[in-house]
Amino acid sequence: MTENRHILGYFNIIKNEPQYTPAYHLIKQSQKKKYPHFLILDEMNLSHVERYFADFLSAIESNENIPLYGKDELEIPDNLSIIGTVNIDETTYMFSPKVLDRANTIEFKICSAKDYMTQKLNKDTPNGDVEYLEDILNNQELRKMSIHELEKIFDEEFWDKFSDEILKFQNILKEAGFGFGFRVINEITRFMAAAYKYENKPEKWNENWKRYFDAQIKQKMLPKLHGSQKVIGETLDKLLESCKDYPTSEAKIIEMKNVLNKQRYVSFIN
């Protein structure tokens, strides 16, 4: 795919009629049915994502409709989730910062062959409000809350600690040219608010909040990282020091440092 016609269709001037795609029909159906719909783009980085997905990125950002052929427009409803699978090799393309800023990057590790074959894989058991997680349309107003509205969800002690942690990572990444702005901060905060609801809104949210912030460090802050030893070597050292309470992110940074030492260059997705 190199342009959005492969997702949204196009106007066939020979037949003088629109040519629709399965993705278009799914989106139109999701506008009529108020249960969750998922648009899954397999191997979405076989082409430059920005070339065929730019209209979606703009619509997600602005909450406006996607202009189509003629005067037609396409609404992206709140009950539609877009998921893309990605492989990184010599046949694929990396994502731009614009795409990474608007997504949660979830990395799936290769499991042990022995554990898989003997069915000894670790399986976490959810211990929070599972029904809240199962219905992704729950608490939709959270998506539109401003940072000041989100602040009111938490107690002052947590908010001070949380904002200090975000600032710490923002400053470290900014030094190397990988800083993040309001959009990323808002999305991280919404994620934390959803986690707080999943945890049944504990009166004092102490150590357990760090597991969710750990996920957001890895999914929202680190994915843009790439460069040579000179560019990000010191940054990785500072991040490693700051991630002692965040084991998932700490392990990722150690992995990146090892690759950097061997190859003199590293990116988040190796």
Show which residues each predicted segment covers.
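AAA+ P-loop NTPase catalytic core and its hallmark functional loops
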Residues: 1-135
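Alpha-helical lid/collar subdomain of P-loop NTPases
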Residues: 123-270
